C-alpha cells in the first residue's frame, strides 16, 4: 500500500459512529462487517472517475488507551496528519480523529481513533467511551517502567467493558512508545512472551517523534480488524448514545506534556 493512497479527514458531525451522516447502515450479507457501511457497486461503470456512491465504505471505532503522557495523542496526530509537535496539552476525557485509508480500489476503510484520557479521574467514564469499539491499542512509555506495569490493568479494563458480537474479546495491539529516547530499552523476548500470555495480537516499538512504526502498526491492526469484521460486527447502537463535541484537534488548557 502506497503512502499516497492514505489520506486523513475529520468528521464535522457527532463522533458517535451510530449517528454519522456520511455512512448508511446496510445490514446485508455482503456488507455487515463494519460499524457503519455504504456499498453501491456499479459493475457497468466504464468511467475512469469513480463516483462516490460506487465506493464501499467501512467505519471502525478503535480505542487508544494507556497511562497519561505515554504519547497516545501524538501517535494519533502523526498517523492522521503526518505532523509531530513536542508540546501537547493533556487530553481531558476523550478526543477523536478519523483516518481514511484507501485499502483497495473502490474500498475506503475509516478508523475512528478515540484518544482516551489516562488520568484515573476519568476512569469511571471508560465504559461509555469503549462502547461499540471493534479494536483497541494500549500504549506504554518505554522510558517510564510504571506505564508498562499499568498495561495489564488497561487490558483487564477493556476485557470487562467491551466484546465482539460473538462475546469474544476485541483484538488489542500493544505499542511500546518513545523508542527514540536514549533511556528506552526494548526487551523483544519479554514482550513476545507478555503479549502471548495476555492475548495481545502483537506489539510494535514506536516513536511519534521519529515516525517509527506508526503506519506499520496501524496497517497491522487494520488487517486484523477486517479479518474480525468478516464474522463479527458490533451490536446496533442503543438510543442512549454518548454526545460529544468535535474538538478539531484542540486540547484543553491543562498542563502541557511532551508526548512522543
From Swiss-Prot:
* Lipid attachment, kind S-geranylgeranyl cysteine: 258-259
| Residues binding GTP, per UniProt | 66-73, 115-119, 177-180
| SMART domains named among the record's database cross-references | RAB, RAN, RAS, RHO
Gene Ontology CC, one term = endomembrane system
User: SUPFAM superfamilies this protein is in?
Assistant: P-loop containing nucleoside triphosphate hydrolases
Q: Which UniProt keywords apply?
A: GTP-binding, Lipoprotein, Nucleotide-binding, Prenylation
Name the residue ranges with Basic and acidic residues bias.
248-260
A GO biological-process term: intracellular protein transport
Q: Does the keyword Transcription apply?
A: no
State the family it belongs to: Belongs to the small GTPase superfamily. Rab family.
What is the protein's given name? Ras-related protein Rab-32B
Species this chain originates from: Dictyostelium discoideum
Q: What is the lineage of its organism?
A: Eukaryota, Amoebozoa, Evosea, Eumycetozoa, Dictyostelia
UniProt gene name: rab32B
Amino acid at each position: 500500500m502506497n503512502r499516497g493512497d492514505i489520506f486523513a479527514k475529520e468528521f464535522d458531525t457527532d463522533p458517535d459512529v451510530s449517528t454519522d451522516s456520511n455512512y448508511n447502515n446496510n445490514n446485508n450479507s455482503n456488507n455487515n462487517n463494519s460499524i457503519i457501511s455504504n456499498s453501491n457497486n456499479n459493475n457497468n461503470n466504464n468511467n475512469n472517475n469513480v463516483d462516490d456512491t460506487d465506493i464501499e465504505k467501512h467505519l471502525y471505532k478503535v480505542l487508544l488507551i494507556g497511562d497519561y503522557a505515554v504519547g497516545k495523542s501524538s501517535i494519533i496526530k502523526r498517523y492522521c496528519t503526518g505532523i509531530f509537535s513536542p508540546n501537547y496539552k493533556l487530553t481531558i476525557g476523550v478526543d477523536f480523529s478519523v483516518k481514511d485509508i484507501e485499502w483497495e480500489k473502490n474500498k475506503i476503510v475509516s478508523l475512528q481513533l478515540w484518544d482516551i484520557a489516562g488520568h484515573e479521574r476519568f476512569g469511571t467514564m471508560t465504559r461509555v467511551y469503549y462502547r461499540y469499539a471493534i479494536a483497541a491499542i494500549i500504549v506504554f512509555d518505554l522510558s517510564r517502567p510504571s506505564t508498562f506495569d499499568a498495561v495489564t490493568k488497561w487490558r483487564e479494563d477493556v476485557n470487562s467493558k467491551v466484546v465482539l458480537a460473538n462475546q469474544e474479546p476485541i483484538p488489542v495491539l500493544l505499542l511500546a512508545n518513545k523508542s527514540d529516547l536514549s533511556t528506552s530499552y526494548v526487551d523483544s523476548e519479554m514482550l513476545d512472551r507478555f503479549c502471548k500470555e495476555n492475548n495481545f495480537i502483537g506489539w510494535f516499538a514506536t516513536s511519534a517523534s521519529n515516525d517509527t512504526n506508526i503506519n506499520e502498526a496501524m496497517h497491522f491492526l487494520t488487517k486484523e480488524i477486517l479479518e474480525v469484521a468478516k464474522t463479527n460486527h458490533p451490536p446496533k447502537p442503543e438510543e442512549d448514545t454518548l454526545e460529544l463535541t468535535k474538538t478539531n484537534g484542540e486540547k484543553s488548557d491543562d498542563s502541557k506534556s511532551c508526548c512522543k
